[in-house]
Amino acid sequence: MAKFIKSAQYFDQYPVDKQFEICVIGRSNVGKSSLINALANEKIARTSNTPGRTQLVNFFDFNSFRLVDLPGYGFARVSKDKQLDLATIIDQYLGYRQNLCAVFQICDINVLTNDDVEMSRYFENQNYAHFVVLNKVDKVNKSHFDNNKQKIAKFLNISVDRLLCVSAQKNTNVATLFALMKKVVIETRQKQLLLKKEEKKSSEEEIK
């Protein structure tokens, strides 16, 4: 059963352990909280019609991994000083959190912006996996994604196989998204175990 753990503003307030983390990030009001609740199949994240309500790093326990909800980029309806604070919160998590194994960037399939593009490009050269989740697919024509996925992928500078359409409202593809998150965590764990074995073997050979 998924549950809320804590909110944190500063890096030293984050959970201290080696649990793998999946991060969700997106513009304000793209439905991140609703999607988290859909993944949990219960209300564990606060939802609001007011953009920009998430202004801390929120941690949720999903048993095999921890889900981390970052403040929305785009910073709707906040002062310039608060914008700087939120940017710092986002940067310190994405730049320094060693538990992070993948980022799922949540976008509104109806409104893709330059902010979405800039954030997608930021993830290009990072050491963790990056996927784009197009939320609110229930509000577009059924064939919209299939007809435009190449254009959407090009606009966001990401490969088509890293795009996934969902609807938190209608629960469309939510199970598929959850399965993908668990798969990424398993693959990351396997890679780390393999790396440790190789390091141990190399160390033993040096001793000989």
From Swiss-Prot:
GO BP: division septum assembly
Cofactor(s) the protein needs: Mg(2+)
Binding site for Mg(2+): S33, T54
CDD domains, A to Z: YihA_EngB
Cited SUPFAM superfamilies: P-loop containing nucleoside triphosphate hydrolases
Keywords, in A-Z order: Cell cycle, Cell division, GTP-binding, Magnesium, Metal-binding, Nucleotide-binding, Septation
InterPro entries with a match to the protein in the record: G_ENGB_dom, GTP-bd, GTP-bd_ribosome_bio_YsxC, P-loop_NTPase, Small_GTP-bd
PROSITE patterns associated with the record: G_ENGB
Domain called EngB-type G: residue spans: 18-187
Tagged with keyword Lipid biosynthesis: no
A matching Pfam family: MMR_HSR1
Functional note: Necessary for normal cell division and for the maintenance of normal septation.
Stated family: Belongs to the TRAFAC class TrmE-Era-EngA-EngB-Septin-like GTPase superfamily. EngB GTPase family.
Protein name, as recorded: Probable GTP-binding protein EngB
Species the sequence originates in: Ureaplasma urealyticum serovar 10 (strain ATCC 33699 / Western)
